[in-house]
Amino acid sequence: LGNRNKRMKIYFQRLVAVSVCFLLVFLGSNYSKAETVAPITLNPKDVEAFTNKVIPEKMKKENAAGVALVVVKDNQILFQKGFGFSDKEKNTPIDPKKTVFRLASISKVFTASAVMQLVEQGKIDLNKDIVNYMGGLKYQNNMSEPVTMEHLLTHTTGFDYVDPRPEDIHYQDNDYTMLKDYVEENMPTVVRMPGDTYTYDNFASMLQGYIVQNLTNSPFYKYMAKNIFYPLEMHNSSFVMTNFIKEKLATGYDAKGNAIPFYQTRPTDMPQGSMFSTGSDVANFMIAQLNNGKFKNNQLLQKETAEDMQKTKFALHPKYPNMTYGFEFFSPQSHNGQYVFGKGGNIPGFSSLMWLIPEHKIGVFVVTNKDSSALPVEVFDDFMNNYFPDKTKPEYLNPNEEELKKFEGVYRDLRLKNLMSHVNISEGKLYVSDKVYGKQELKQIDPLLFEDEKGNYMEFKLHKDGTVKEMIHWNSGSSAVKLSEPERFKDVDENHPYAKFINPLHQYEVLQANREGNFTPESSLTRAEFAYWLSQIAYFTPHSKKEPVFSDVKNHPYAPHIQKLYEIGILYEKEGEQFHPDRAITRQEAAWITWQYLKMLGAPSADATLKGETDDWAIESVKNIVGHRLVGPEVIYNEDGSADYLSKQSMKRQEATALLFYVLLSS
């Protein structure tokens, strides 16, 4: 169980790091191509001076063990250098030509390139249903339009779950998971119209690789070795671990500088993230992309294909595009008016970034053997400010209140589903508030584009019926959709003491009304209902399809959600133990389950003086719930800060909404 909890904690923190913290550095610029492109002077001596100044200070700040950087320009490697160590214990220096790193999501652009090769050969039609290329595998589609390869390449599939499972990082050397088996077992469901919304989509990139494998009758990693790595002379690159790669692989380190044990992935041959490579090898790929698909005498892609890959293919707003075929755009402001796209990668122990500026034939790749590091994107920011310092300040419009009304509402991020953005008008101005930045004024710079107080853009999408239902703010990795206002519970009026908890959770689709339209706030909550509500908040993994471990929940309607909490390490099962799903949950039981969840997410401990009676096994959990004040008005705090949590009482439904509302805000 210890390994399960540790793995889950690493998984969640990595997901958040990639989806939020990593993206926070990419805050802003206009991605439209510059009307005139002046040549930029870039020479090895100047780049070396720049990197020698910037990288060591960022390594010190980040406690990063090592960094490799490579810059290409005009179809050649202009500069490459290693900093620090690939193994601190052995003092092995980083060598950009020899040190192998895990590239994580940068793998996706290589996979997309393989897809485009098959498009050139006529084996794939970008606008045809992908089921035609899946070798008999099928996907459930709740919409009227099929998923196409275009949707896979632009991450606009409409899939319900797009990220890997916690157990996809594992420590079993001989555990080989076949790509086809993984895809078949974990196929998501299409729940939004394909092509309508953008969500960073790991499964879409994995499906691309599976389709390449299926159409070529070759294991994915072998196709990539023969058709991508070999013509690009990428001799130190692979999608699967080999002894040759393992010998050269840098040791990955966590945030505290501790070495991360060697691990494998599921599937083993993972198109969306298992690639290993060196700085020099990646440089050859960037050269081909910037040279009309050609590296030396080898034509990796036709000129037209390479150009097509680099064009904007999905944009919620023309000034804030999201995807090319395989590459992504970062948030606009930091690009200083240049047309820049690239790809970031983050996996335990490694963080990386590649960016291309095609009009200047410049490409840069930065990688560090440090977990969840902002170093690569900070180097990007400094690079752009140093070599492309011009920034154009936007001119603001002056809309009236009537023009702003269509933007009001609560928007839910499609990937980070606990991230809610509240957009509202106050005194004639538009504001947005969320749990990351708080409340900020939005200034309009275009009919559907705004800038917040920190300089981040917020773009909205106007639908054919004239309504606004979607936006992207600082989390450029996903659209956020406007939630409909549900019909209020008949038995919860606006003055109800728990209305401020119940109504938001109702709108967030955690709570549902009964047949009479009531919530029954003072009724006791069952253990199964509590597990279901918490499962809805634990958004980052789907409900389980496996046989429940608890014998008494096998036919229960909430069995998949109870099993999910077990699989992610929140619930435990002893041999022969039952869950008692329909028994009322006590407040100390709810506190214990909730604290397991919050600990898994890395919540700090909080102390509290407890009054009343609490069982020994629940004291730690209740202290933390009380100490963090994750309670409703039923808990009264004394002047000295102590409180009676009423631990042994049954938890009422209204009380559970207070607890889970605060959990949602903190997770």
Show where each model-derived region lies:
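Hydrophobic core
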Residues: 20-26
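Feature responds to low-complexity, polar/acidic, surface-exposed segments characteristic
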Residues: 12, 30-35, 166, 480-497, ...
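Flexible glycine/proline-enriched surface loops and loop-helix/loop-strand junctions
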Residues: 94-98, 189-194, 205-206, 262-272, ...
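Catalytic loop of the DD-peptidase/beta-lactamase superfamily, centered on the K-T-G motif
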Residues: 35-81, 216, 225, 230, ...
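Bacterial N-terminal signal peptides that target proteins for export
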Residues: 5-19
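Alpha-helical scaffold elements that line and support the substrate/ligand-binding pocket
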Residues: 69-76, 102-130, 152, 185-186, ...
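Active-site-proximal loop and beta-strand segments within enzyme catalytic domains
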Residues: 45, 61, 83-202, 216-218, ...
